[in-house]
Amino acid sequence: MRKDSESPVISNHNKVGFIGLLITLGIVFGDIGTSPLYVMKAILHTGENINESTILGALSCIIWTLTLQTTIKYVCVALRADNNGEGGILALYALLRRLKSKWIYILAIIGASTLLADGIITPAITVTTAIEGLESISPNLPVIPITLGIITIIFFVQRFGTESIGKSFGVFMLIWFLLLGMAGTVSITSYPLILKAFNPYYAAMLLARSPEWFLILGAVFLCTTGAEALYSDLGHCGRKNITISWAFVKTMLILNYLGQGAWVLNHVQTASAVNPFFAIMPQNMLFFAIIMATGAAIVASQALISGIFSILSEAMNLHFWPRMRIKHPTHVKGQLYIPMINLAMYIGVVLIILLFRDSSHMEAAYGLAITITMLMTTLLLGFYLHSKGVARVFTILFMGAYCTIEAIFLAANLSKFLAGGWCTMLIGGILFLIMYVWVRAIKIRRHYISTKPLDNYYQIISDIKADESIPKYASNLVYVNHASKEGTVDDKLLYSIINKQPKRADHYWLINMEFVDTPDTLEYGCETLIPDTLYSVTMHIGFRIEPRVSLYLRQVVEDLVADGKVDLRSAYPSLRKNGIFGDFRFIIIHRVYYPESSDNRQQNLLMSIYALISKIGIDEPKALGLDTSMVVVERVPLIINHRNNSIRRITHMMKI
């Protein structure tokens, strides 16, 4: 077996040290680090009376949500559930799919679709809230046009990659978190009793006595929405870097939340009219704070967009999403750019901004989808703990506790459904439909692929090669074999070689592609089936690796030639004497589903939707990274079953 890496340059941020911690701040904590911009403002807009017990209770909820949800669940537990160093809900699913559960993929696609839906609202709310801070300096400032301009720039620069500016994100976020902590600390000194919020008693009393507790919890939940992204970025920075950095980040966040609470209690009458985040900033630093907030929003948006590209790349290899064109704008491993997704996200974010107009209305749309993602992650983590032999009592307690907590948050966020939550749920529902249909359709297509034992056809393939009366089709003929059972081959592949148009070649290559549960695996094994004639190459590809069959096959061939296992010099004397290799041609067997071949209406509907969805992706030759000038696509029907309709023979023709 041979192994290769995806990129010539590998960026490794997993080493613990000052640089690693700095990079972690820039990559991982952008989302959760910008939550102080809008969390307290959202709490004040719930309609609850502003008094000491309310603010202390809300702050206590924030502190203990960050502790229970972010620290314990994600930092202490989830970060240990890594797939060869990779994290996130799809990496977790890849670990679990070997359990062969028929429905566990449903949890994964629900979680992934709601996570992606939440990603549409995050850039909109963070950038809008930051720009709204300028209204305190210039009330007539056109917030929406400025916000749209910044969003346009963010999405436009994706095509060029962010390798150069990405290195400065960590330094910027370090300054941002220090600003949060210092501003909060200064404000706390004006109302030291705010420190009582560390006592969970105040959170319990608020939830027990307030008739608006569900609205307050819906706002409080916004403080931890970035926790899922923290888990997804595990592969970029490593568990130790994230854990150490989180201790600093959490401290700065809590100081800022407490500082905002102190300011609110000192300005009860006017608190709901302004954003407490900007109010606690010294007047001579306000403009600097707005610039920093805008920059932090851009960093958060950039990290989120890159994360979505990575998630969808994983989804493609897990067969959850149609294959799309992926570009690598830099040599940094894992840095992707998916043009169609970038455009779709940009349109979505712009529509969100134009629809909701200000951050207060966006807060209603924010949080509901990610609550569902977190609930799905909890369920998958429970299965993971069980599969690792963790004590059943601990597994049940973990799942029970966090399912209860997240179900309460879900109920609280459902109260915002009509006010805006419907938007992210609609987006999430559409994404779920795409993923579900794609998974089911692929299973249907695989189910009806007919296979045959390959060794039964060794002799006829050898005879075709030796039969010079058959025109030579290519020196090297390559097929992608979709048969899953070892030693078998797709029957339409044999039909293509033998029956449809006998294809004589010097060498026949069968490519078997196996997408494995590990992220960065890229290996192959080669078996000679007929000496100097038929070869079977099995490629094991990790779920984060882009399948580039042409590139990988070239490396395989170079290895085999170097080892003397195959002679690929052209059979034509004029070319052979000059050591020129023979040509390669790829044959792709594309099965077309015809609804007329099935009586199953539900299946026909699903396959019709699948046909529509497939139009947003690229065709199989491009998906496999093949040179299209060397590819022939043969379309054949996907036979589901044969209807009983048959043509009746008559013995006497009617005269006309």
Language-model features, listed with the residues they occupy:
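The structured alpha-helical core of multi-pass membrane proteins
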Residues: 2-656
